Design a protein with these regions (language model features):
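Helical segment within the ABC ATPase nucleotide-binding domain
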Residues: 141-154
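Helix-to-loop junction immediately C-terminal to a conserved catalytic motif
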Residues: 3
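A short, surface-exposed alpha-helical micro-motif characterized by mixed small hydrophobic
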Residues: 168-170
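Conserved ABC ATPase "signature" region
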Residues: 62-97, 124, 145-148
Length: 225
């Protein structure tokens, strides 16, 4: 619903205090709300740089009339977009793959590319769907590091759906636990891991006293760093 795929039957979705409930995904995109996917969707036969340059909306070069009658304007815009892409590549420290076909990237590199796409339009809120899935530990650390930087240095807000509790513990406060489509509880990760209602809902048991109980390993966790 937050991403615009479904229209809620009640309640509101607010972005910067403005009601965006029911807006389609492309309108949310223009307002700065973007998402990544558990399975990356790259343009596999385009380079990493070209994938980034595809992101900004309403580029003059997309219009046949502008491309034909305003070539100088199109060239200026393309230069600016390419410069922005280079800045993103440098920020994420993946300039070494800028000319690589995106389809040749590893799973973790594709997730970095998806994160880079959100930077091409200076997103306000980014929805991260299972960003740790299929990513080796080294690249996952890179992902988490860059998410932290985007939050602390550029003011991005992240809404995370994730089952990797180490990642959630590092990134997210608060953590929201949902069951059967409703919010069960929210709070700091350490409190969530000891919450009897969470343990009962997901394991049908009670806490054993272990502060790192696996009880919170299954809930979908949504959070803002």
């Amino acid at each position: 619903m937050v991403a615009g795929a479904y229209v809620p039957t009640s309640g509101q979705i607010l972005l910067d205090g403005k009601d965006v409930t029911g807006l389609p995904s492309h309108e949310l995109f223009r307002r700065g709300l973007l998402r990544t996917f558990q399975i990356a969707h790259e343009f596999s036969h385009m380079t990493v740089t070209e994938n980034l340059m595809m992101v900004p909306d309403r580029q003059s070069g997309e219009n046949l009339s502008s491309a034909w009658f305003q070539p100088a304007r199109v060239a200026r815009e393309e230069t600016a977009v390419r410069r922005k892409a280079e800045e993103v590549l440098d920020f994420l420290k993946i300039t070494h793959v800028k000319n690589e076909l995106a389809g040749n990237l590893s799973g973790g590199q594709k997730k970095l590319l998806e994160l880079g796409r959100t930077m091409m339009v200076d997103a306000k809120v980014v929805l991260l769907d299972e960003i740790a899935a299929g990513v080796n530990r080294t690249l996952l650390n890179d992902l988490v590091f860059n998410i932290e930087r985007l939050n602390s240095e550029l003011g991005y807000t992240f809404f995370v759906i994730e089952h990797d509790m180490d990642m959630i513990a590092r990134l997210c406060d608060p953590v929201i636990v949902m069951a059967a489509g409703s919010v069960m509880t929210q709070g700091h990760i350490e409190d969530i891991q000891k919450n009897e209602a969470v343990i009962e809902a997901y394991f049908g048991g009670s806490p054993t006293g272990n502060a790192t109980s696996p009880a919170a390993e299954q809930p979908a966790s949504e959070a803002q760093p």
